[in-house]
Amino acid sequence: MSAVAGSPLPYWRLSGFYFAYFALLGGVAPFLSLYFESLGFEPARIGELVAIPMLMRCIAPNLWGWLGDATGQRLLIVRVGALLTALTFAGIFWRLDYWWLAAIMALHSFFWHAVLPQFEAITLAHLGSQSSRYSQLRLWGSVGFILTVVLLGMLLQREGMGVYPMAMLGIMLLISLCSALVPAPPQQPAAAQEHADGFLRRLWRPGVPAFFLCVALMQLSHGPYYTFLSIHLEALGYGRGLIGALWALGVVAEILLFLVMHRVLGVFSLRALLVASFLIASLRWVLLGTLADHLSVLIFAQILHAATFGAFHVAAIHFVQQRFGERYQGQGQALYATLAGVGGALGALYSGYAWQGVGATLTFGVAALAALAAAVILSLRLREAD
């Protein structure tokens, strides 16, 4: 049952949307750079093309978040955004030159990044006081991611990269279908304090600006990972099937963490979880930059994805929920997505130029320093009670 007005929680419909949405990410994260490489683009151009959707993530969520909070029509925004994501991406079948692809990346991602922050707010509204169950819904996104990574990796190894755009379009249409099946959440009256404290007052509370800065640093540190890990592993002699399996391993670890995350939240503070996630991320990037040719080290580094994404994301979602309340949840989640987009775009850009100029080890080294800096900032700026 949902904690809101005794209404039943639409578990499978919410979970189904997460499954489809992150299935698309499972096609993008490991394989988009390989697709652009198959078209003959050099690393700097690949980094730019991968950065464009991340730049849209800096713009789109705040616009859609404001619109969602102002109108209350978050579910409509999700449905329209999902449909337009697919329709605009279909332009990729027309031309494959750099500037056309840049336009396609910008246009479809403007709508794609409208979707998730609003859906997170919808999910939290359905959960009500049972927000600790969020990870039990979100884990199905990880299942969708891992299935796509494995199955698409096998498909691309057999059929080649030419089938990649059609596979992506199919997943986008599935997202649109799943969004149509999700019911609107029950309406909750806003607390008096929510009306008294505006969005900006909540944003400038102690520790909140530092949190959002560190969100950007976390995603910046993931730049080499999401943009060049597959290329890095191919250069080290790993086959595409094994590369897909290694991506999937990280998500398996993430799923296992999601299964117990509601208990972890009851033991550790959000501050402790966030700081630990950054410290582990720093270690992970050092390992990937220096010892990825050792399969055992690579496997261990991928298992650490449970912390660098899983624990960090759940702790961050709860932090935003606590700081912004129901009234400003759409804008709070949108700002989280935006700062993640800023960091991700900067990470993709710097990794593209650094990879070409100084190589994998130093590129991952910069990522490790960014994560370490964020750990220090949060340990100093967040209270232990957080």
Predicted segments, located by residue:
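Helix-loop boundary and gating motifs at the non-cytosolic
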Residues: 5-54, 208-215, 219-246
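Structural signature of the two symmetry-related core transmembrane helices
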Residues: 76-90, 272-287
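Cytoplasmic helix-loop-helix junction between adjacent transmembrane helices
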Residues: 106-140
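Symmetry-related core transmembrane helices of the 12-TM Major Facilitator Superfamily/SLC fold
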Residues: 163-180, 362-380
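Interfacial helix-cap and linker-helix signal at transmembrane-aqueous boundaries
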Residues: 36-37, 67-68, 139, 154-159, ...
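Helix-to-loop junctions at the C-terminal end of transmembrane segments
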Residues: 59-73, 156-157, 256-270, 355-356
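Hydrophobic core of transmembrane alpha-helices in multi-pass small-molecule transporters
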Residues: 19, 88, 98-115, 216, ...
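Juxtamembrane intracellular "pre-TM" segments in multi-pass secondary transporters
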Residues: 2-8, 182-215
